Amino acid sequence: MKTAIREARPEDIPQIQTVRNSVKENMLSDPALVTDADCKEFLFERGKGWVCEIESQIVGFSIVDLKENNIWALFMHPDFENLGIGRKLHDIMLDWYFEQTQKDVWLGTDPGTRAETFYRKSGWLEAGTHGNEIKFEMTFNNWKNRR
């Protein structure tokens, strides 16, 4: 199975939405809450995104928001979890982010999920809450020391 990770393009948005709405954890209460226009704004105006393709199908993606210093999204299609793809998308995204700025980056995720475990293992530090989610932060120095 050949995987290819590349920068996201506008034509990827429908498949990005499919992946986002296929997840079993951190599900949107209403899929209409995240529009194609939102995806476009975060991908091309506020930050940058990456996708992983297998046989022309997007199976995962990551998006970082430079304006709010936030990981806006990191999602894998459930059929392609536990293959190391999420880790690669995460690392490419953070490498790029910290090439742009040395400001701390943060994210929120639901407690008791595999995502929580993933971020803890990846060196993210718990920094309180964001709504009902756990807020995690990564500093420039923590990231560079992990590389």
What are these regions (language model features)?
Residues K2-T18, A127:
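A short beta-loop-alpha structural element at the N-terminal edge
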